[in-house]
Amino acid sequence: MGTNISDVKASIELTSTGQLQGSIGGSSVDLGPCRIISINAHLTGADGEITIHDNTSAAGVIKIHLKGGSASNDTLNFNFGGNGVHFATGAYVTLAAIDSFTAYYA
């Protein structure tokens, strides 16, 4: 069982592949080390795919890979158990058949 994480924040919405960003002091900034607790995505077609690398580019270790949905306008929601998934460097998100992605992180 994980600990109670009380400082969860929503990322800046991604509409295409890119580094996960947060809002700090009213500005969008690339996130460094973080822990993804859950994700929400909106699909543009069947088989939406999300790959998240522990890096600032798609060259890093893949820590999350999800595929789901059967039609356009489906949503894909996933909650990671325990303390979520830790990214030591940053979180680079690759999206396919998805036009909106938000991660909830600590």
Residue ranges and their predicted role:
Residues 2-106:
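Surface-exposed, low-hydrophobicity beta-strand/loop segments enriched in small/polar/acidic residues
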